[in-house]
Amino acid sequence: GVTVVFEKEGFDTETSNGEMILSMICATAQEESLSISKNLKWGIRKRMQDGTYLNGMSPFGYEKQESQLIPIEREAEIVRYIYSSFLVGVGTVQIAEELNRRYPKENGTWYVSAVRRILMNEKYIGDVHHQKNFTPDDLPLLCQKNSGQLPQYYVQNHHKALVSRQEFEKVQTLLKRKGTELIFRVFLW
């Protein structure tokens, strides 16, 4: 096998003492890593409760400055267009097509899924919902929906809204209704 000599620490893995010391150092490092991780998560959850936490990416229509979401007016106009179009009966497919004509993206295409995400995102009424999803501590580290495994935090009026609460709630009702109609249509045909 391969022997590793740690000159600074004064041991090598060829001896049983060296292997034992290496095992102890590894176990200590693992515990230290877990402790740091728990402390970081505690700090993040505390900031979620206080309403001062913002996760990595800003939603379309906003930019992050320090711990604030600030509207980007050109993008905010597009968000308002999406909501107003949907509220007058334009479907998500047609909205995406019109966005691609009127407001082409620099880095790609407007898809129906992006339109739906904007229509369903509470950030556009100025609210933040933390821990809707989470990544568990154990392997595999795959993001999953939070179905009560961790506390969720909902902060109202966290930042400037791009659409009214009334518009948002009406859109949610319409989305649910359209989803139900689609399910029935699939079963009928």
What do these predicted regions represent?
Residues G1-E7, F11-L22, C26-W189:
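Conserved catalytic breakage-reunion loop centered on the nucleophilic residue
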